[in-house]
Amino acid sequence: VSIDLFDSLPAPYGLIRYGVAPDHPRIKGIVNSLHEMLDSGKIRFFGNVLFGKDLTLEDIKRHYHAVIFATGAIKDAKLNIPGVDLDGSYGAADFVSWYDGHPDVPRTWPLTAEKVAVLGNGNVALDVARVLAKQADDMLSTDIPENVYQGLKASPVTDVHVFGRRGPADIKFTPIELRELGEVEDVEIVLYPE
């Protein structure tokens, strides 16, 4: 069996590379296992290939017996709440892509507010809050891109509040994520039952 892997990005590993917080080296360590698979010779990687432009379904069908579309989930859910489109309101997917150095997002991020509200009940919401709440220097031991480090260092953010859109029974974050957020210097976790 041989596998050809096409990606619109120049480097492989998708959301593991561009969707995991830089201070989570254990999860990012999966890249090493994937790298071994790519080096095995059974999988070939072709980067910078745009499906529909550089490669069509007809092209693929002519050369392959099976096709699997594995596109990831790098889009934000559309929130139907007032103010979601105001200046200063951003989706987590773009922010995560920025702090992970995704090549398709701007190198600078408008971190101009002192107080930030993060809406969400999942791990990504807590990752975003943790990255914003940490001192930039605490991220130096990670693989954080230099431009992101500089952006966080210059950031005026002093208060980060996480708001869940549903009740406590609907939380999606893991206890590990909550504990990691609570271990950040000067972070106080307050949970409201309603």
For the regions a language model picked out, list residue spans one by one:
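A short helix-to-beta-strand connector/capping loop
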Residues: 39-45, 86-87, 155-158
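Short hydrophobic core segments
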Residues: 62-72, 117-119
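General small-molecule cofactor/ligand-binding pocket signal
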Residues: 4, 44-46, 90
